[in-house]
């Protein structure tokens, strides 16, 4: 949340929700802050309501809508700015041998400054419009430290 004005141009919150969602505003010392409830049973984080960050790709404070697939996975990389890589492990059935094999997929997702995500944490990501060349998902829920749970590692 320290990168409030990290860009060269002055950043301000865009208010164009087009009446699709219930628009809410909170008045703070910085002025009026707009946020919305994304629905689907997910709550708006407290940092999105009370924070001062400006992110045009945040599902809670901008006009990005969550639609389509909702997935869960483990964070394996946070090296990109406001983007992380989520690993999803799954089993694939091989009919010839009547057995399953372990597979995985890496999904890049945008993370809002409202979440303080570290590697190894479990996150829920929701599909949205394409945000860049490879990013089509947005973090909508953060569960701290999935390392304590039993899971299979990279093979």
From Swiss-Prot:
Task: Give the top-rank taxon of the lineage listed in the UniProt record for this protein.
Answer: Eukaryota
What Pfam families has UniProt attached to this entry? Answer: Ribosomal_S17, Ribosomal_S17_N
For this UniProt entry, the molecular function terms from Gene Ontology, in alphabetical order, are:
structural constituent of ribosome
Gene3D superfamilies, alphabetized: 2.40.50.1000
Entry coiled-coil feature ranges: none
Recorded hits in PROSITE patterns, A to Z, give: RIBOSOMAL_S17
Give all N-acetylalanine modified positions: 2
Which biological processes are named by the entry's GO terms?
A: translation
Please provide one cellular component term from the Gene Ontology annotations of this protein. Answer: cytosolic small ribosomal subunit
Which of UniProt's keywords are assigned here?
Answer: Acetylation, Ribonucleoprotein, Ribosomal protein
Q: Which NCBIfam families match?
A: uS17_arch
Family per UniProt? Belongs to the universal ribosomal protein uS17 family.
Its recorded name reads Small ribosomal subunit protein uS17
Q: What is the source species?
A: Dictyostelium discoideum
């Amino acid at each position: 949340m320290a990168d409030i004005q990290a860009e060269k141009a002055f950043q301000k919150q865009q208010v164009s929700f087009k009446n699709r969602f219930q628009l809410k505003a909170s008045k703070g010392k910085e002025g009026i802050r707009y946020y919305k409830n994304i629905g689907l049973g997910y709550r708006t984080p407290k940092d999105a309501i009370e924070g001062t960050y400006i992110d045009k790709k945040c599902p809670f404070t901008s006009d990005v809508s969550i639609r389509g697939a909702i997935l869960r996975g483990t964070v394996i990389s946070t090296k990109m700015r406001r983007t992380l890589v989520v690993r999803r492990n799954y089993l694939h059935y091989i009919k010839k041998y009547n057995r399953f094999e372990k597979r995985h997929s890496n999904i890049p997702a945008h993370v809002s400054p409202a979440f303080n995500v570290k590697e190894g944490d479990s996150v829920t990501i929701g599909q949205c419009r394409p945000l860049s060349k490879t990013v089509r998902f947005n973090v909508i829920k953060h569960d701290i430290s999935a390392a304590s749970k039993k899971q299979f590692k990279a093979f």
